[in-house]
Amino acid sequence: AYQVLRDPASKKIKIAITYTNRAAEEITNRLEGMNIDQSSIWAGTIHQFCMHFIIRPYAMYSKRLCKGYRIIDDYSKKAYGREIAERLGMHLNYYDDPFQYENVRTEYKRVLKEKKEIDFDAILLISEELLASCAFIGSNIASVISSILVDEFQDTNELQYSILSTIYKANKSIILMFVGDVNQAIYSSLGGVAKGKKELETLYEINFDSLSLKGCYRSTQRLVD
C-alpha cells in the first residue's frame, strides 16, 4: 500500500510473495478495504510467481517445456509415487512415503519427462535453469518490477532465494523487503531456510535495514501475557 501511495503514477509492478494462496487473498482483501488501486500489485506464492513471470512467457527457451507441458498437483504426484513403487515390487504401508526411495524418485522424474508433465518442484527448478541460461529473462522481469516483498521469509528455501536473487541483481533499484520471524520457521523439514540479516545481505549484495514489530497484531494482549 505504501509503495502504491508513494508513487501512484508508476506502472511498475509491486510483487508480494506469500507462502499460501490464503495469505495472498488476505493481502488483496486488505488493500481493497483500504481503497488501494491494485492494478500494479501482484500477490501470490513463489510457484505462481514463477509460472506467471518465467514459465509461461519463456517456456519456449526450455528444452523440456518447448513442446508443451502439463502441471500436475500433489495428489497426482502421490498417485504416481504409489504406482511406481508397486511396479518396482515395493510393498509399502499407507503411511510410507515412496519418494524416500531413490529408485522411486528416479523413475518418477523419468515418467514426468515422458508424459511432458511438471510438478511444483519442477516449476522452481526449471525457472532457475531458465534464469541461469538466458540472462535476458531476468533482465526483462526485473525491468517491470519496482519492489518485491517476501512474507514469512523464514520458510523460503534455497532455490526460491536464488530465483529472487537473480531477478533482483538484474535491477538493483528494486526495493526488497523480507518479512518474518526466524524463530517461527516451521517448514525446515521441507527445505525452508531462515536466513539471518547478514546471510541475506551476502546473497543479495545489499545492505538491509532491520526493523522489529514490538506489538502483536494477531492476539489480544491478555493472550500474549
Predicted features along the sequence, with ranges:
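P-loop NTPase Walker
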Residues: A1-Y61
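Conserved catalytic network of the ASCE P-loop NTPase/AAA+ motor domain
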Residues: R6-A9, I36, S139-I141, Y168-K172, ...
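Accessory N-terminal region flanking or inserted into the helicase ATPase core
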Residues: I15, D73-L149, E158-I163, S188-G196
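Alpha-helical scaffold elements adjacent to nucleotide-binding pockets in ATP/GTP-utilizing enzyme cores
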Residues: E26-L31, F49-F53, V144, L159, ...
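Hydrophobic "anchor" residues on beta-strands that sit immediately upstream
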Residues: I41, S147-V150, M177
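DNA-processing P-loop NTPase/helicase core
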Residues: M60-C66, M177
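Conserved Walker B
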Residues: I148-T156, V182-N183
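Conserved RecA-like helicase ATPase core segment
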Residues: I163-D225
